[in-house]
Regions:
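Interfacial/gating helices of multi-pass transporter permease domains
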Residues: 38-63, 123, 180-181, 185, ...
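Hydrophobic alpha-helical transmembrane segments
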Residues: 126-130, 155-204, 378-382, 396-420
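Membrane-interface junctions at transmembrane-helix termini in multi-pass inner-membrane proteins
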Residues: 79-84, 134-158, 181, 347-375
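Helix-loop junctions and terminal segments of transmembrane helices
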Residues: 39-40, 68-85, 206-207, 266-300, ...
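Interfacial segments at transmembrane-helix termini and the short loops linking adjacent helices
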Residues: 10-14, 113-129, 251-258, 304, ...
Length: 443
């Protein structure tokens, strides 16, 4: 297929990154379709209360996911891109750091539970889920394939993993009529399954994990670079997942658990395409880094084009979901119908998520790692404060409103910081379609 010529990109590079991004998209969309279908029949089987227990428990453990990941993924890609001959050292060091962090998170989650337990939820559920942080350490192989612009292998692993996961849950629902605890095991197994798949694919491509090695100085370098992103990631986890927990705890055991189970379906649809900016930015990040190094003017153009693309994609998605929300809940049992108007509000936060992902890579490229912590921390504080204010009177709708405002606040905080204000203005131009109209009138 002949690709159109786009200013700022040479044709060969464009084709390479277009194909890579397209493959990632296919993999994620295929996985998404499988996951959404699975989530619908699992939610209809568990009903709001049990679904609330599962969603609140996973949200609780997710708060520690950033600590387990150490915020290393972007830096691993960057290191592999700059020093490809040090592949085994970079991957080995990163794997040891992430697996150690995953192990440490297990007792940390236990200590957190002693101080802040969730009402009417057994710790055994939390304990099982706490192993997901350890299993996610294997995603260093994902970073390797990203750096090589070989996303077809990531796609293959994800689709295979999701098909197997869907089959397991199908059996639990329709054959075994399983209890809730088995779905907890299944969720944890999902993470392990994909992680093992990455390793098998890595070995299949002629690589071996047994050649990996650890470098103490590299470990220090990575941790020094990533600690702001660790804290930032924790803050992201807080303002992405704390709403589910607060909804349950503020509204009380029975009402709160059912509300969180219903709200989980909102979040699933609203955040369904949040992988798109991650895929696009992950695939284009090497090209953006090259432009920053070789041609500052092209670098700025690529950033503006990226912000424009994020707005157009997220705007189309938000409009579609907002209009289709009543139809979406036709697939659910009547117990979930109250979530339809909540989804129509919550989905508008995706615009700021898309822009936030794109601007986050800009911050990394420019070395403004600490700012990622500042802005996400700000968003988390806004989200928590608004949840306390709105949930008692508005319930799920209050949570949705708080989330949208928090996403907006976190993304556009950079406009108030002098050294990042130009990029904040670029995002505003994209948000209000100013940049798009400028391009139209220049033709």
């Amino acid at each position: 297929m002949k690709l159109p010529i786009i200013k700022g990109f040479d044709e060969a590079a464009l084709k390479k990154y277009f194909v890579n991004t397209g493959l990632l998209m296919i993999g994620r969309i295929g996985s998404l379709a499988i996951k959404m279908a699975t989530s619908i029949y699992v939610a209809n089987y568990l009903l709001p209360e049990k679904n609330g227990v599962l969603s609140t428990s996973t949200a609780y453990v997710f708060l520690f996911a950033a600590l387990a990941g150490l915020g290393l993924d972007s830096f691993i890609v960057k290191e592999l891109h700059q020093f490809p001959k040090k592949r085994d050292t970079i991957l080995g060091t990163s794997f040891l750091l992430k697996s150690t962090a995953g192990i440490i998170c297990i007792p940390l989650i236990f200590l957190a539970w002693q101080i802040f337990p969730l009402s009417n939820i057994a710790y055994s559920i939390i304990l099982i889920l706490s192993f997901t942080g350890l299993f996610q350490s294997f995603t260093v192989v994902d970073a390797y394939f990203q750096s090589e612009v070989q996303s077809k292998y990531i796609m293959q692993v994800q689709i295979a993993g999701n098909v197997i996961s869907a089959l397991i849950k199908f059996l639990l629902v329709f054959v075994f009529k399983a209890e809730l605890i088995y779905f907890v095991y299944a969720y944890t197994f999902d993470i392990l399954l994909v992680s093992v798949g990455y390793f098998l694919m890595y070995n299949r491509k002629g690589r071996s994990v047994f050649t990996w090695n650890y470098d103490k100085e590299l470990a220090k370098k990575l941790l020094k670079l990533s600690w702001p992103l660790i804290i930032s990631g924790i803050m992201v986890s807080v303002y992405m997942k704390i709403d589910t927990i607060m909804l349950k705890e503020i509204l009380g055991d029975d009402i709160g658990t059912k509300a969180s189970g219903t709200y989980a379906t909102v979040v699933m649809f609203s955040e369904a395409l949040n992988f798109i900016p991650v895929v696009i930015v992950s695939s284009l990040f090497p090209a953006i880094l090259n432009a920053r190094r070789d041609d500052p003017e092209r670098y700025q153009k690529r950033l503006q084009n990226l912000f424009d693309l994020m707005v157009w994609l997220s705007l189309a998605f938000a409009l579609f979901i907002a209009v289709a929300s009543p139809l979406i809940y036709k697939f659910y049992k009547p117990e979930f119908i109250a979530a339809a108007p909540v989804l129509a509000v919550h989905v508008w936060g995706s615009i700021f998520v898309f822009l936030g992902v794109a601007s986050g890579q800009f911050l990394i490229a420019e070395g403004f790692n600490k700012l990622t912590f500042i802005r996400t921390g700000f968003g988390a504080v806004i989200n928590i404060a608004l949840n306390f204010l709105l949930i008692p009177t508005m319930g799920m709708m209050g949570t949705a409103i708080a989330t949208v405002i928090a996403y907006f606040s976190a993304t556009f905080l950079i406009i108030f910081i002098p050294k990042t204000r130009p990029q904040g203005i670029m995002m505003l131009k994209s948000l209000f379609l100013v940049s798009a109209f400028q391009k139209i009138f220049k033709r």
